Amino acid sequence: MNQTIIKVSVFLFFIMFIYSGFGKITSFKKKTLGLSKKTGFPYPINELGMIGVILLEIIGSIIIVSYFLDKERTQKYITKEYIRYICLLLLAFMIVVTPLYHPPHKQIIAFLSNVTTFAGLLLIYNMI
């Protein structure tokens, strides 16, 4: 496999998660209120969940991208198991979020977009 193509592909793939994480920061209250309405959980619980998702999307993505951009240097600090764990957390997040925010009977294109993102995460998990 061409390593340059892999590096560029992983970088481009995770831009979406990083952008989404920063979007949640800039509209934190609005996003958290929307989540509270969808889940029915109290607002403080949704705040904690939103903070966790923001950290996962931004920091988790940066860690994975760093790993793929310079494996030799980052393998001293970040193990393959750690990268797999982050991928599994993102996969679990996608499983929960996709039907909640994009029910297929109402938003088939957004739903399929998330399914495709899920497939991309599986490929990245498999490349580690």
Regions found by a protein language model. Name each.
Residues 1-30, 43-59, 63-128:
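Extended, low-polarity transmembrane helix blocks
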Residues 34-43:
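Interfacial loop at the N-terminal end of multi-pass membrane proteins
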